[in-house]
């Protein structure tokens, strides 16, 4: 997975990420709605997951990760967030569209995005597009910039975790 983030001049961050998996769209969506897969993704970043709920093709879970030093004054040593991923029904070719939302607890920040799963010649492409904003006067943009490498790392971990998961399931 390759993730690119761009911090906008007037605040907010654009997130664009692409991954490719040697699997069908149905297999990829099944993986991405499995709490055990997300547990592995977050474990790779030093975090944990809890309170996972799956309803149809939607997943909601709580994530706890070590907080970057720039935000420990706001949240302490652990950053917790509610993560929700919801998929629409499959199209004729198996493609899926969905929404992703991550809301950190204890600070006025939010990530909202769109997810696409599409078949290609050799498997399935996963595309995320979205925004991340921190609504803290005077320091919000600085916090967004500090979050950029952590967001990039989080999306990139999904590629390795996905490859491993699909090889063993």
Predicted regions and their residues:
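Hydrophobic ligand-binding cavity/cleft-lining segments
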Residues: 3-64
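Short, surface-exposed coil-to-beta transition loops
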Residues: 14-16, 78-84, 97, 109-114
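Generic structural detector for well-ordered beta-strands
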Residues: 18-22, 86-88, 116-118, 133
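Short secondary-structure junctions
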Residues: 39-45, 93-94, 107-109
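Short amphipathic beta-strand and strand-loop transition segments with alternating hydrophobic
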Residues: 46-54, 86-87, 112-119
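Glycine-rich portal/gate segments that line the openings of hydrophobic small-molecule binding cavities
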Residues: 51-101
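A conserved amphipathic terminal alpha-helix motif
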Residues: 84, 88-89, 140-169
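Beta-strand/loop substructures that line and gate deep hydrophobic ligand-binding cavities in soluble
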Residues: 95-149
């Amino acid at each position: 997975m390759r993730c690119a983030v761009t911090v906008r001049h007037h605040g907010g961050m654009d997130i664009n990420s692409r991954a490719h998996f040697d699997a069908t769209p149905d297999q990829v969506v099944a993986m991405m709605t499995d709490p055990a897969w997300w547990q592995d993704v977050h474990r790779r970043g030093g975090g944990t997951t809890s309170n996972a709920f799956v309803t149809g093709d939607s997943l909601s879970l709580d994530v706890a990760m070590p907080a970057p030093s720039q935000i420990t004054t706001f949240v302490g040593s652990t950053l917790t967030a509610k993560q929700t991923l919801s998929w629409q029904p499959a199209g004729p070719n198996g493609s899926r569209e969905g929404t992703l939302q991550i809301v950190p607890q204890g600070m006025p920040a939010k990530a909202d995005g769109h997810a696409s799963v599409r078949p290609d010649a050799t498997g399935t492409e996963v595309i995320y597009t979205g925004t991340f904003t921190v609504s803290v006067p005077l320091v919000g943009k600085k916090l967004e910039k500090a979050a950029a490498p952590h967001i990039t790392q989080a999306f990139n971990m999904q590629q390795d975790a996905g490859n491993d998961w699909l090889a063993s399931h």
